[in-house]
Curated annotation (Swiss-Prot):
This is Fructose-1,6-bisphosphatase class 1. It comes from Shewanella sediminis (strain HAW-EB3). GO terms for biological process: fructose 1,6-bisphosphate metabolic process; fructose 6-phosphate metabolic process; fructose metabolic process; gluconeogenesis; sucrose biosynthetic process. Binds 2 magnesium ions per subunit. Mg(2+) 2 binds at D103, D106, E268. Mg(2+) 1 binds at E84, D103, L105. Belongs to the FBPase class 1 family. GO terms for cellular component: cytosol. It catalyses: beta-D-fructose 1,6-bisphosphate + H2O = beta-D-fructose 6-phosphate + phosphate. Homotetramer. The gene is fbp.
Amino acid sequence: MQTLAQNLTSQGVNASLTQLIHTLANTSKEISHAVRHGALAGVLGATEQENVQGETQKKLDVITNDMLKDALKGDDTVRGLASEEEDYIVEVGDKGEYLVCFDPLDGSSNIDINSLVGTIFSVLPAPTGELSESSFLQAGRQQVAAGYVLYGPSTMLALTTGQGVQLFTLNPETNEYLLTTEAMSISKDTGEFAINMSNQRFWEAPMQTYISDLLLGTIGPREKAFNMRWIAAMVGDVHRVLSRGGIFTYPTDNKNPQKPYKLRLMYEANPMSFLVEQAGGKASTGYETIMDIQPSEIHQRVAVILGSANEVDACLNYHGLDYSEEPQL
């Protein structure tokens, strides 16, 4: 099996990006160690702080954020970083070639129940001139690398540099990432969907109708049985989609009119969309392709529909219908 280093060399990834990927990968090994030790290390539970999203921070949110921030500050290829747990961008150096956006511990609410969590990251080119928040506001198409690390029964790194999606598994004996899937591929059709059904009453009419038709199975207009899956961590649900197909969505809802969207564009939706597209899938908000969105702020949120290409298209067809004459759902 190829090591991560050997694989990056075989793909012709440049030295600077290779160095940055190794920094992220090596830090993920430390995070994996902290996650595995859980209560033994006293890292479970919540802090008394909230992040910029207004969400109560878990202890491991803060710990993993600091681990990544410190590691990236020590990497001379990094110009600046943005994190879910940081109110503002963090300037690292004036000569780095890259900007890094990350969610240090996606699904952190799962920590206390010993369920799946992960790290998501996006790498963008650093523009010349003075660094500011606007330096980070690049469409997803500008990403030069993206990936996630899944901390589950085994620790796995899914990575793209624009040459497909490679999956690496951390060997606990050697502490090295080894290539276990050379090219992840999402099937075009699927019989699985992932959505938080508890929000059903808050969805827009297109998503209400789409999910209702899936639930009708063989007796409904889709004439096909579907199974629902939900891990409550984007990193876990998207990993399943990349592994065996499916559609994952966190759609627009009116549960909180001030926050109609849940997932963050820069460090959740964009990197996952890059991975999904590189594996042959599609990613949309329901009305526009996610990686074509011009960001307006670092912590911007968007609706997300991604996964098997034909099923995403089917969902988008519902969003193109006229619901003006339908009764209130």
